[in-house]
Design a protein with these regions (language model features):
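Short, Lys/Arg-rich flexible segments
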Residues: 1-36, 93, 98-107, 121-140, ...
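Extended, compositionally biased alpha-helical segments that mediate assembly or anchoring
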Residues: 2-7, 252-358
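Extended serine/threonine-enriched, polar tracts that run as long, contiguous segments within proteins
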Residues: 178, 210, 216-269
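N-terminal "assembly arms/tails" that initiate or stabilize quaternary assembly
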Residues: 1-86, 326-358
Length: 358
């Protein structure tokens, strides 16, 4: 009787699929952004593509039974172009000697690939956090310095009011909070427990999803400043993500897409000169904030389209003094007209903040 070993070769596609799912499970903030892939960018100049955004027009009123002395007013229709580009190549590269591969580790799938996937995921997460922190905000709201739960809830209500007045989408609204906000809200009865389904179970996003408050899904991030929070709609930022193809010179490799659309490439080869096996995991990425012209009603009751573009899809909140932190439309050539036309010049009636401790 002949003894034989049945070796089962694991396909690169299967390893890459495992790695991309591991990477996707580590993401929190990037999953809150609108995603676009590589097909929109192929052939684009300077790695940039202009995404067409429909224009907006004001509505006017032609007086009933007027003497027809004045003609209709014609407004110019202008479509906008949002320039988005890939600006990053997040990667993790490592190598194993023959001795390490045979004696020290259990293989690429159990040790190395998971570590590489988590490293790339952290890079994507940090990029999304930076996009949040460096973005432009037409509305910033202070929630006081005392850590009072009612002040925090008031700030969230004020953020909701601002988004509503700016005409932001009510679909997929999320409140991304730092650890100090998390501590305050955990002790508040206003936080409704989240019902996490199978699609997000056992992931960093599921762990970060606390529940709902005032119409927002509340997601905690340890990577943003503890005293900051961001009220977002699902299209506040664009997350560009794609995996490059596999070069013919690679010994093994695959490009994969997770169930949630996160792309990643894994390459493996062997260097005979140094007798080491090399593994590289990478993904292309970029982030872009979305700004819009604002349509508002002027003093004559006429709809007007703003000259400048503003952030009307997200609001920044901070555990800081209300009087000095809360700002409505602090920048822009027609900021005063826009703020007045939207009714967003100050904290709305009905919201009263408790004074900060002395």
């Amino acid at each position: 009787m002949t003894n034989s070993l049945n070796h089962v070769k694991v396909k690169p596609e299967k390893l890459a699929a495992t790695a991309v799912e591991l990477m996707e499970r580590e993401l929190v903030v990037p999953k809150l952004f609108a995603r676009k892939g590589i097909e929109d960018f192929k052939g684009a100049r300077d790695d940039t593509v202009n995404v067409r955004v429909p224009g907006i027009l004001p509505a006017r009123d032609y007086e009933w039974r007027n003497n027809r002395a004045q003609p209709l007013s014609f407004d110019e229709y202008r479509e906008r172009k949002l320039a988005v580009r890939f600006g990053g190549n997040a990667y993790s590269a490592t190598m194993l000697t023959d001795e390490q591969r045979e004696m020290d580790f259990l293989g690429w799938t159990q040790d190395i690939l998971p570590a590489q996937s988590r490293a790339v995921a952290r890079k994507l997460e940090y990029g999304a956090i930076k996009a949040l922190q460096t973005g432009k905000y037409s509305v910033t709201i202070g929630a006081g310095t005392g850590g009072d739960a009612q002040n925090v809830l008031n700030a969230i209500i004020e953020a909701r009011h601002a988004l509503n007045r700016m005409g932001a989408s009510k679909v997929k609204r999320t409140l991304v909070i730092g650890s100090d906000w998390d501590t305050i809200l955990q002790g508040s009865k206003a936080l409704q427990a989240a019902a996490v389904g199978d699609s997000v179970a056992e992931s960093a996003f599921a762990d970060a999803l606390l529940g709902k408050v005032k119409g927002f899904d509340v997601v905690v991030s340890e990577d943003i400043a503890p005293d900051e929070a961001y009220a977002l709609t699902g299209d506040s930022f664009v997350f560009l993500n794609a995996a490059p193809g596999i070069p013919e010179s690679a010994v093994a490799g695959a490009s994969m897409l997770s169930q949630d659309g996160i792309a990643m490439r894994w390459l493996r080869d062997y260097d005979p000169q140094y007798q080491v096996e090399r593994s590289t995991v990478n993904t292309w990425y970029g982030y872009q904030q979305v700004l819009d012209p604002v349509i508002y009603v002027d003093d004559q009751g006429q709809e007007v389209v703003s000259d400048e573009e503003y952030n009307i899809r997200s609001v920044k909140l901070k555990l800081d003094k209300v009087a000095t932190t809360t700002k409505y439309f602090p920048e822009g050539s027609d900021k005063a007209k826009v703020a007045k036309g939207l009714g967003l010049t100050k904290t709305p009636p009905g919201i009263t903040y408790l004074p900060d401790p002395a």
